[in-house]
A protein has these predicted regions:
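Zn-dependent metallopeptidase/amidohydrolase metal-coordination segment
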Residues: 2-9, 66-67, 262, 332-382, ...
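N-terminal capping segment at the start of a domain
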Residues: 1-20, 112, 308
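Catalytic-core environment of secreted peptidases
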Residues: 33, 37, 49-79, 87
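Midchain, well-structured core segments that form catalytic/ion-binding scaffolds
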Residues: 112-276
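Active-site-adjacent substrate-binding region
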Residues: 5, 9, 144-192, 230-235, ...
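A short beta-alpha structural unit
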Residues: 18, 246-255, 267-274, 299-318, ...
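Alpha-helical metal-binding/catalytic segments enriched in His/Glu/Asp
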Residues: 65, 74-115, 198-204, 213-236, ...
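Flexible, glycine/charged-enriched surface loops at secondary-structure junctions
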Residues: 44, 100-101, 158-162, 213, ...
Length: 393
């Protein structure tokens, strides 16, 4: 895997953050590989790369597919890069078999999908009109790096306007980044959209006291309160089939072994593929927080930090992918994505679909991220048949 050698990290990991020297080398290698199979290459103002193979009918819009080459720090070899190299393989197959399609066909490498350096999905956000080129080019990373300057340094500051392309549909192949397909012994995930997400911060205020002198029944223990709230919210979700919850941050005061916790702040991440379910969960969780706080003699404050509604992909793209999986006799299921992808941006302006392939133990953003050759073949083959169908319709 020559691409994985660029930014190679310990334990088979890859560190190739957006607009780094390693990202530039990966872009160079992709360009070298793909030149024999395309007619045109374009780079837009924020570094999105487009490689176009013309169709037999030049007046028709192109079909686009791709993903991203940048990675998390000490991330894996398959996240993003699979979707790019899969399209390279599709283009190679069409070229070697002299297959001509009515619609033109293009590969896109979206600039800066990961959140390893800059804010995520900036390239696809500009393409879809969610951000302006100026906003992205002026962005600074946590280390102070300037997006526009870094883009010039690696040689990928283009001048094509994102709106200059006419696109019929967009498909993206990606590892699932979760354990569902592997757990159900399936080959392909036909992605229906992405889960909505709500984040909230919960603050619980109790009363500090001596760990040895205050009886249990007289305590206002903020940490005990938080523990019961989290357990109750988990129980609520376990009765459902369409949501997940994670408590990933927690601050405890005074954080002393011999002092009853007086204050706890914890962050919740709640996701569901259905807007009404997210709203219902918010109400159920808020009610649980209130009642359990009273039980523990604590006060509470709930702050909704963000809300992203669920994403729904295009029905016609979903049907094309499902039809391809059926024809190839692959085991598949329709499923939502638990993570955000460039496709979630692109769907705002173009009919969009996604294909998932299983990954070992559902692990991603980690050096142990892995998908077998057989799994990758089935994913790429499904993409090939789906794209071919879209380019003929």
């Amino acid at each position: 895997m020559e691409m994985a050698e660029i930014g190679k990290a310990p334990e088979n990991g890859v560190s190739r953050p957006a607009l780094s020297k390693e990202d530039g080398k990966a872009r160079d290698l992709l360009t070298e590989w793909i030149k024999p199979f395309v007619d045109e290459m374009m780079v837009d103002e924020v570094g999105n790369m487009f490689f176009i193979k013309q169709g037999t009918k030049s007046d028709l819009p192109i079909v686009l597919s791709g993903s991203h080459l940048d990675t998390q720090l000490h991330g894996g070899r398959f996240d993003g890069v699979l979707g790019v190299l899969a399209v390279l393989e599709v283009l190679r197959t069409l070229h070697e078999n002299q297959i001509l399609l009515d619609h033109g066909f293009g590969l896109v490498n979206w600039s800066n999908e990961e959140e390893a350096r800059f804010c995520p999905a900036m390239g696809s956000a500009v393409f879809s009109g969610k951000l302006s080129s100026e906003q992205v080019l002026d962005c600074r990373a946590s280390d102070g790096s300037h997006y526009g300057t870094c883009l010039k340094q690696i040689g990928y500051a283009g001048n094509q306007l994102p709106s200059s392309l006419k696109v019929k549909a967009y498909l993206e192949l990606h590892i699932e980044q979760g354990p569902v397909l592997e757990n159900e012994s399936l080959d392909i995930g036909v992605v229906t959209g992405a889960q909505g997400q709500m984040t909230m911060d919960v603050t619980l205020q109790g009363v500090a006291g001596h760990a040895g002198t205050v009886p249990m029944r007289l305590r206002a223990d903020a940490l005990a309160c938080a523990s019961e709230i989290i357990s109750q919210c988990r129980s609520i979700l376990l009765k459902k089939e369409d949501g997940v919850m994670t408590v990933g941050t927690m601050d405890v005061e005074p954080n002393s072994r011999s002092t009853i916790p007086s204050k706890v702040v914890f962050g919740m991440d709640i996701r569901s593929p259905h807007s009404e379910s997210l709203e219902q969960l918010k109400n159920q969780f808020t009610e649980a927080i209130s009642s359990i706080s009273q039980k523990h003699h604590c006060t509470n404050n709930v702050e909704i930090r963000s809300f992203k509604p669920p994403t729904e992909f295009d029905d016609s793209c979903i049907e094309v992918i499902e039809s391809a999986a059926k024809k190839l006799q692959y085991g598949y299921k329709r499923m939502p994505s638990g993570a955000f992808h460039d496709a979630c941006m692109v769907k705002e302006i173009i009919p969009t679909g996604m294909i998932f392939t299983p990954c070992l133990n559902g692990v991603s953003h980690h050096p142990s991220e892995y998908a077998s050759q057989e799994q990758l073949f089935k994913g790429v083959n499904t993409l090939l048949h789906s794209l071919s169908e879209l380019c003929r319709k």
